[in-house]
């Protein structure tokens, strides 16, 4: 009798009883359970991760049966964290737990596809020609070439074999190298944060043939340009365990609970530990439920809120009641003490120029190494300019007995060896108080910001300055700290245009930002006070989690830097549980030395060709033709409009020509033919 028939025989199941007949023992058929055992049976367990479009790098146990992935579970053998700190596990998410479904999805491309028109042309050409000749006959025939290029975007892809696909690719590459040069071949390889080996396979191939490697981190706006602008380094941020050490966390423009699922538990655990969590985001996103306070500015107005927070912190924690920890941090570890030249204008006012450098004090090569790259501070001890260690000039080109070991922040004059104490402000010992002009880009009403109009495109602020002699001329200089405070409109008793109270509608006050962001002025004041107070009491253990919500928006560099200003004023960067925490993508990998040797073919050649993808696609896909914001809107009202009268693409190309942006190709000829041309030219000169 079958199992199905047996299950229908209700009265024959009883085989006994117990508890004086109150309970009975039945005979049930359990063969159906085998189907479940077969479903979860496996031959082996493989450790892996889910590297496609995810940089979480979570460790998973992948169960394999007959070569097929049948299911997966999270691994739990991560190294333990310090005592009292939650462990990293469980790491994983529902997307990872169902990843085997992606592998065998009907929508996944599992074989090469080619346009039907190109396949027909190729097969016809290969009947009589070798591979490279066949490709040349197609691309050099206008009608044949148009037959498949005109079909782009219209579908019509058909299946081909791997052998045919590889032959076409190799033939096209060899043809291009022979006729135009290897630097005319460019390629993009998936980011190493997904799979180091997969990325390296593509870049190694391009490096070996002399092609141009397209960048990844900057192209899709995962790279925060504010980081190299501020520190000269690319996204050096803490890992998620550090959140637990924080006393105050602002989640600003990143949806941690959704986009960083493996790390999100640290945020919740930190909150249980007493950390206050504030979410700054226009929409009620997932992370809002994990926060204590939701602040929702209008989209694209984050910088205004951040500047108002900076205004409050500078006024209360740096001017009215200077916090000792903040003062020492800013003096030793930021650019606040660095001197800036004040450039006179025709109207008798000044603008901030460049930083004062060692070369301005008379230091020259070879006695002084890199004098144009060493910044200058004002020394409180000697009451004179000093060349503080730690600037870029001390990092590059160190020489034995000269700059060796001086790339640090010890309070020493790098050129004289004397102890120094960089001075933050000239407020109490200035030689003069000068009027400084700053550009104000909110001086005109714009769509979406109807209440942002002020009286002028130029702000005039009073700044304390010192008169020093640079290159034989008397020049006014000011510290970055004094310039920043005046720019924020903080009233420091110098008179002029500044905010007497937070209610004044002057740029960067809480009242000013309220008209732009929609966030109540009192909220901005409270946020500033709470964050700074937490940072003060914990010596910098307060942080801001940032991400794509802000970074992938127009003017991201300015928005990010307005937030970074808050972090630096509160002495948080470099402190466990403090600083800026940018989480978009993943540009770092652990075995970088060996990986780069493999990926960029350094075992064959010392350097590869690189091209920044942002410029590449902006120019070659004609995106520059669709700019809707004229360059004049981006230009400072203090700038010379006659000098800057082009378009965005003009200045992008100019940056490439000057070497500010990596670019390839760099020559207008085939580089493989340069040597032969040079020999021919030399031979002709010798014969003549």
What residues fall within each predicted segment?
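Active-site-adjacent helical/loop segments in soluble small-molecule enzymes
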Residues: 515
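N-terminal export/assembly segments and adjacent metallocofactor-ligating motifs
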Residues: 1-324, 328-473, 482, 486-493, ...
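Amphipathic, charged-and-aliphatic alpha-helical interface segments
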Residues: 489-499, 503
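Active-site lining segments that contact anionic ligands and/or coordinate catalytic metals
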Residues: 57-59, 275, 539-542, 687
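A glycine-rich, hydrophobic/aromatic-adjacent loop/helix-cap motif
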Residues: 492, 505, 511, 523, ...
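Short coil/turn segments at secondary-structure boundaries
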Residues: 180-190, 218-220, 321-329, 496-500, ...
């Amino acid at each position: 009798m079958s199992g199905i028939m047996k299950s229908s025989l209700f009265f024959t199941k009883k085989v006994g009883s117990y508890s004086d007949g109150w309970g009975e023992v039945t005979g049930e058929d359990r063969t159906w359970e085998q189907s479940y055992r077969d479903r979860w049976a496996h031959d082996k367990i493989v450790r892996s991760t889910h590297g496609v479009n995810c940089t979480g790098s979570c460790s998973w146990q992948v169960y394999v049966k007959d070569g097929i992935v049948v299911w997966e579970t999270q691994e739990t053998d991560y190294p333990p964290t310090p005592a009292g700190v939650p462990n990293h596990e469980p790491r994983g998410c529902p997307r990872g737990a169902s990843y085997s479904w992606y592998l065998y999805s009907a929508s996944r491309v599992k074989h090469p596809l080619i346009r039907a028109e190109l396949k027909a042309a190729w097969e016809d050409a290969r009947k009589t020609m070798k591979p490279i000749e066949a490709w040349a006959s197609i691309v050099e025939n206008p009608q044949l070439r148009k037959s498949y290029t005109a079909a782009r975007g219209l579908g019509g892809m058909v299946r081909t074999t791997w052998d045919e696909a590889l032959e076409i690719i190799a033939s096209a590459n060899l043809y291009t190298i022979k006729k135009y040069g290897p630097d005319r071949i460019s390629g993009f390889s998936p980011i190493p944060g997904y799979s180091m080996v997969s990325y390296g396979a593509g870049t190694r191939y391009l490096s070996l043939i002399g092609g141009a490697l397209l960048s990844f981190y900057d192209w899709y706006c995962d790279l925060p340009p504010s980081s190299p602008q501020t520190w000269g380094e690319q996204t050096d941020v803490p890992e998620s365990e550090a959140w637990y050490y924080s006393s105050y966390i602002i989640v600003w423009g990143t949806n941690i609970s959704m986009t960083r699922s493996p790390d999100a538990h640290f945020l919740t655990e930190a909150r249980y530990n007493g950390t206050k969590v504030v979410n700054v985001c226009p929409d009620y996103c997932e992370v809002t439920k994990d926060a204590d306070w939701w602040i929702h500015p209008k989209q694209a107005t984050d910088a205004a809120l951040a500047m108002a927070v900076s205004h409050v912190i500078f006024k209360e924690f740096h001017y009215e009641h200077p916090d000792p920890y903040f003062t020492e941090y800013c003096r030793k570890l930021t650019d606040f003490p660095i001197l800036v030249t004040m450039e006179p204008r025709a109207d008798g006012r000044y603008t901030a120029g460049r930083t004062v450098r060692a070369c301005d004090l008379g230091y020259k090569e070879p006695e002084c190494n890199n004098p144009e790259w060493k910044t200058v501070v004002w020394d409180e001890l000697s009451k004179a300019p000093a060349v503080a260690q730690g600037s870029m000039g001390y990092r590059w080109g160190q020489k034995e007995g000269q700059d060796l070991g001086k790339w640090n922040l010890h309070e020493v004059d790098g050129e004289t060896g004397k102890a120094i104490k960089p001075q933050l402000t000239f407020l109490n010992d200035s030689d003069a108080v000068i009027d400084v002009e700053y550009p104000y880009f909110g001086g005109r009403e714009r769509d979406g910001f109807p209440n942002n109009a002020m009286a002028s495109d130029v702000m005039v602020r009073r700044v304390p300055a010192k008169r020093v002699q640079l290159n034989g001329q008397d020049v006014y200089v000011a510290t970055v700290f004094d310039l920043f405070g005046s720019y924020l409109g903080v009233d420091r008793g110098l008179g002029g245009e500044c905010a007497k109270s937070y209610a004044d509608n002057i740029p960067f006050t809480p009242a000013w930002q309220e008209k732009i962001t929609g966030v109540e002025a009192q909220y901005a004041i409270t946020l500033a006070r709470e964050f700074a107070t937490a940072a003060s009491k914990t010596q910098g253990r307060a942080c801001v989690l940032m991400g794509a919500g802000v970074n992938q928006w127009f003017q991201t560099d300015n928005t990010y830097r307005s937030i970074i200003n808050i972090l630096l004023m509160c002495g948080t960067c470099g402190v466990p549980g403090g600083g800026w925490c940018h989480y978009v993508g993943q540009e770092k990998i652990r075995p970088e030395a060996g990986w780069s040797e493999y990926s960029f073919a350094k075992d064959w050649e010392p350097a590869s060709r690189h091209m920044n993808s942002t410029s590449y696609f902006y120019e070659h896909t004609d995106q520059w033709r669709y700019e809707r914001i004229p360059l004049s809107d981006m230009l400072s009202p203090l700038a010379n409009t006659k000098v800057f009268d082009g378009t965005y693409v003009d200045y992008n190309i100019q940056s490439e020509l000057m070497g500010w942006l990596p670019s390839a190709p760099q020559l207008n000829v085939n580089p493989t033919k340069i040597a032969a041309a040079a020999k021919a030219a030399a031979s002709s000169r010798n014969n003549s």
